[in-house]
Amino acid sequence: GMANSVVASVDDVTAGYWNPSGLVKQKEKLQVSFMHSNYFSGLANYDYLGISTLVSENSTLSFSMVRFGVDNIPNTLDLIRNGQINYDRVTSFSAVDYGFFVSYAQKALKNGLSFGGSAKVVHRQAGDFASSWGFGIDMSSRYESQNDWTFAIMARDITTTFNAWNYNFSPEEEEIFLQTNNEIPQNSLELTLPKFIFGVAKK
């Protein structure tokens, strides 16, 4: 967002997502934030919930949850049976990504410097036939100079985030895959490699 300047400028509960080290700028004892947004004329929905609390004068703890999903996707696997088309057999499913973050930020001994990190659990679901669970860690640092410049770095998925996919199809559904020359998905492991984001902002 904003050419990555948000990584440096964020200073409230939403820092748990953008840059955990920015949580130390929170002034209130407790902050709560919620957001809902539609994409592609309502085809996809994004939801965010964040809660953060001061642990001490120098540290902050937060919990964040995000959901991004496409709902009511037609499932046409059973549309044609024995050469007959029957739209009553068309069902619907959702493809949804969930992210759960527990974040902590701490001011360093050096004035203006802070560090933060997030442990995250990622869950993805596509109907009743595909799901995955994964785990990852984000780390960040932020430095605010005396002339109001802020420099920040965010290391996403620094440990390499994994998602273990599990597929569950009935024998009838697998037969449809074979008849239509489609490959039957196999259980697999998806990896997200580390990504470093730099941001600069000025008040």
Model-derived regions: residue spans:
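Subset of outer-membrane beta-barrel
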Residues: G1-K203
